[in-house]
Amino acid sequence: MLKKIVTALGMSGMLLASNSAIADDKNTETATPQSVDLSPLRNLNKLDSPMDKDYNYHQAFKKLDPEQLKKDMQDLLTQSQDWWPADFGNYGPFFIRLSWHDAGTYRIYDGRGGANRGQQRFSPLNSWPDNVNLDKARQLLWPIKQKYGDAVSWSDLIVLAGTVSLESMGMKPIGFAFGREDDWQGDDTNWGLSPEEIMSSNVRDGKLAPAYAATQMGLIYVNPEGPDGKPDIKGAASEIRQAFRAMGMTDKETVALIAGGHTFGKTHGAVPEDKVKEAIGPAPDKAPIEQQGLGWHNSYGTGNGDDTMGSGLEGSWTSTPTFWNHDFLHNLYNLNWKKTLSPAGAHQWTPTNAKPENMVPDAHKLGVKHKPIMFTTDLALKEDDGFNKYTQEFYNNPEEFKEEFAKAWFKLTHRDMGPKSRYIGPWIPEQNFIWQDPVPAADYKQVSTQDIAQLKQDIIDSGLTNQQLIKTAWDSASTYRKTDYRGGSNGARIALAPEKDWQMNEPAKLEVVLAKLKEIQTNFNNSKTDGTKVSLADLIVLGGNVGVEQAAKQAGYNIQIPFVPGRTDATQAQTDIESFNYLKTKSDGFINYTDGSVSADKLPQALVEKASMLDLNIPEMTVLVGGMRALNVNYDNSQEGVLTTTPGQLNNSFFVNLLDMSTQWKKSDKKDGEYIGIGRKTGKQKWTASPVDLIFGSNSELKAVAQVYAENGNEQKFVNDFAKAWHKVMMLGRFDVQQ
């Protein structure tokens, strides 16, 4: 039934993918070396932002009175508006759904989605069928946003709305952090196939690949009626587990979130099935201009209140839909549930043995009562063995249920914010959680300029090569993802499982480097009597800087790469192995690495994706690739793309030789994805290269940048630009010094 309702609600926001789709930047699915898309490297949000160039959210936030904002939010909850009346006289459940669906797009596979940048305001998310009528929720918040202006972001306000609502209805949160910054346009996340692709494809069902975090088209998580709209309880359990694990949630957290969330509010399917198609207008991105960004206009009855049309399911779960309790679990276990249909024709369940105390008040008519409902997905929490364990536990221990929901809600709404150092505001909980990728606070004095000079000399004297130092530092820092601010050099997790065992990090070689750096660290720390210490994380980065500086010196250039100490070393206990494995890259074009799962023709686009994750622009990506090739730091000492007669020296040889027309490039007949550079006159092999290397001479935009670095007179510029880009990568994740 949901498919019919979704069609009526408008397919403009619906997204679908076959089970073979790749959850990555949407451009990777059709990219070839000839058609590499550089748009992920263009920071259009800054260009499109209406804010002043010097606007800083952290500074603007200092003008905010959080307590007054919270009071205004609390007052709003019970100020029902005629144009969209509040169910039960309280917008709290509506705002909980708003926050949940905003944060619930997060996916752990690539860090995309989530609440951090307020993407729910833009297409396609604002028009997803699962987000039906949330445009009204955001509109209800507008007077508050208008009042406080740029002192609070939309993305913070949307999440705060749900959190304040919980507290107002008796569920005390464990805290809330401000610090989310707004985007100004829809991003390029691949959520699945577009409606046009759906109609033209031979996709046989609406199931999404696991990496998409949802399981069916246009939904945040799963179809509440059951898989593909069929009331299959066991199948629903499987899809729930898939969807929530894709967000990084455990079974316990999943049960807490669903059972806790369905303690509040109601679902809407009041329009008769035969009236849905004609009554419901298009989603916001296809709505008539006079509707001013509001979609899903409902011409049935009053169009709101008791005539509201949402998911198509109709009813409430408990008799107290605006108060926290564990009645959802009580009803789940003590009522006998029978399959039925909502007025809109959606599969749902009602009890055959409901007592007067179980009856649910009508959301708008005083004195009218209804039977409670359950979704197919709700019943899965009882019938599935893994979920049943926790529903029973929570049913028998209401206080534990309350505590676990509070923790799961905080995780849901803060997971994509990155480390705790990005949090601002007065309500940050003191407790640290492993999903925050915590690093310990430094309980020692940081190294001085003199100490840094001594450590650099110790590194030079250690016997480690420039290549060893550079690659180790790169492998450590380049785990960063700008999407959810995870990874980076802070924590030195390259010395811990799982990173130390990743293929791309060449574990045997890595172990040698880390052992020597740890020796330097121990000797230095033992020699200091004033409380000064250096972390392994700082030494890894400093070692990389030393390697680059020495390589530049060998080429005749004197540079000093900035070094900002303050990184600390995480412990294995602070590191979630399963979660960190999602940071493992399939390919890293900066070191010509691939695990074999990415086809050769997709490697250039994968490089762009990697550069985007590192928050690089086109020139930065270009100069880093050229420099890394000259430095001879490819994975497994591969010579592909090392287009220089002075390997290990930091110079612009890569670009000079790539653009030299005395070389003719041909595909290798021995190795897929390898190209042979042959002298036009001699006919002899000069070089080998990968598609990643050759894209800088093939793609017109990249070639234009490459030519700048190959020009006579720009040799020093190349070295300087490489050093700046290198430093930028080494500083990724250092939010402790970037606010």
Curated annotation (Swiss-Prot):
Q: Name one GO molecular function term.
A: heme binding
Which EC numbers does the record give? 1.11.1.21
Q: Does the keyword Signal apply?
A: yes
What keyword terms does UniProt attach to this protein? Heme, Hydrogen peroxide, Iron, Metal-binding, Oxidoreductase, Peroxidase, Signal
The entry's function note states: Bifunctional enzyme with both catalase and broad-spectrum peroxidase activity.
**GO term, biological process aspect, one:** cellular response to hydrogen peroxide
Q: What is this protein called?
A: Catalase-peroxidase
Instruction: Name the domain of life.
Output: Bacteria
Q: Which gene encodes it?
A: katG
Q: Which organism is it from?
A: Francisella tularensis subsp. novicida (strain U112)
Q: Where is this cross-link: Tryptophyl-tyrosyl-methioninium (Trp-Tyr) (with M-247)?
A: W100-Y221
Query: Which InterPro entries does the UniProt record give?
Result: Catalase_peroxidase (IPR000763), Haem_peroxidase (IPR002016), Haem_peroxidase_sf (IPR010255), Peroxidases_AS (IPR019794), Peroxidases_heam-ligand_BS (IPR019793)
- What residues make up the catalytic site? H101 (proton acceptor)
